[in-house]
């Protein structure tokens, strides 16, 4: 059975209130949410208790064949939403009847940055029958989105396409991570057959801040080369984009000044990495911070990202630590 599912979530924050409200939600198919949660503590910053937490539910528990999932997030000014998932995402192997419908020419799979002006879902991927997930998020001024899904597991014979696009107003801020697990090592199953395609774009108004596009056929050298995954099967990438308000208004268009602010955050992250022996590397591109994991332990990746997230939330947003309970169930 093929699932075509969509989910729209719109958030706002009244000017006289500190509580973010999920004021609109609409869904088709199996994608859904239950209700908005407000689990964060009261703090010296009274707005922390008003941060809205959402769990995205997908009852089929996995994506396969030519399923298509579309998620749209719209955050109005001053809203702050934490959106996550209750468990790992699973990209299942295709049915045998579909495995032979895709081209065998792996030369059509390329790595690199593509023009982000097109909204065509597969314009940097070859045409194959694939399961797809598309995420489109728009953040108004002073909005904060934390899109922090749990890991995605790519089964042998899975054919996947994921597109993640974030459009930020000048003073919006974003925290987002993606953790990919190739194969199921506990079952001695590797990602030996299939295709993996993943794109991330982060825009600030008309400026493209981040563009990553990976499209690889299983068993290519990208999975074994030191320039790729180096024979590891867990890869994580965490991007943190601050509001431009962190620097003086007259300097907001100067990337070097924002870079100096990010340098200070990077120094604190590296101190955390050293003291906690976290298996993470981090850097910045003068617009945002990127932390990466490459290894064999998905929980080590997740816990390291969590600790870095708490440091960033404290430094940038003056928030006390809070861990969504769903991450421990």
From Swiss-Prot:
Keywords: Chaperone, Cytoplasm, Nickel insertion. Residues 100-120 are annotated as: Disordered. The gene is ureD2. Required for maturation of urease via the functional incorporation of the urease nickel metallocenter. Residues 103-120 have a biased composition (Polar residues). PANTHER family: UREASE ACCESSORY PROTEIN D. Pfam families: UreD. This is Urease accessory protein UreD 2.
């Amino acid at each position: 059975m093929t699932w075509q599912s969509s989910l729209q979530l719109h958030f706002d924050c009244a000017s006289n209130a500190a509580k973010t409200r999920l004021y609109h939600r609409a869904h088709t198919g199996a994608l859904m949410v239950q209700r908005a949660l407000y689990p964060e503590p009261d703090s010296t910053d009274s707005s922390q208790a008003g941060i809205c937490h959402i769990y995205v539910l997908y009852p089929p528990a996995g994506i396969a064949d030519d399923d298509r999932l579309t998620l749209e997030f719209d955050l109005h000014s001053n809203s702050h939403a934490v959106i996550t998932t209750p468990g790992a995402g699973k990209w299942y192997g295709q049915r045998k009847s579909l495995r032979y419908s895709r081209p065998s020419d792996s030369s059509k799979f390329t790595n690199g940055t593509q023009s982000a002006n097109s909204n065509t879902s597969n314009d940097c991927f070859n045409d194959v029958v694939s399961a797809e997930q598309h995420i489109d998020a728009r953040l108004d001024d002073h909005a904060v989105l934390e899109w922090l899904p749990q890991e995605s597991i790519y089964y042998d014979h899975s054919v996947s396409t994921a597109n993640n696009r974030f459009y930020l107003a000048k003073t919006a801020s974003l925290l987002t991570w993606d953790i990919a697990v190739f194969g199921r090592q506990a079952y001695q199953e590797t990602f030996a057959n299939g295709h993996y395609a993943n794109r991330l774009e982060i825009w600030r108004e008309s400026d493209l801040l981040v563009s990553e596009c990976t499209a690889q056929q299983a068993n290519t050298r990208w999975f074994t080369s030191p320039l790729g995954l180096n024979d590891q099967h867990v890869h994580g990438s965490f991007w943190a984009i601050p509001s431009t308000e962190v620097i003086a208004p007259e300097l907001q268009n100067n990337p070097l000044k924002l870079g100096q602010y990010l340098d200070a955050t990077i120094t604190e992250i590296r101190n955390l990495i050293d003291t906690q022996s976290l298996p993470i590397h981090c850097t910045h591109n003068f617009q945002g911070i990127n932390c990466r994991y490459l290894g064999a332990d998905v929980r080590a990746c997740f816990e390291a990202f969590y600790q870095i997230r708490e440091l960033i939330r404290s430094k940038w947003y003056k928030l006390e630590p809070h861990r969504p309970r769903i991450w421990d169930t």
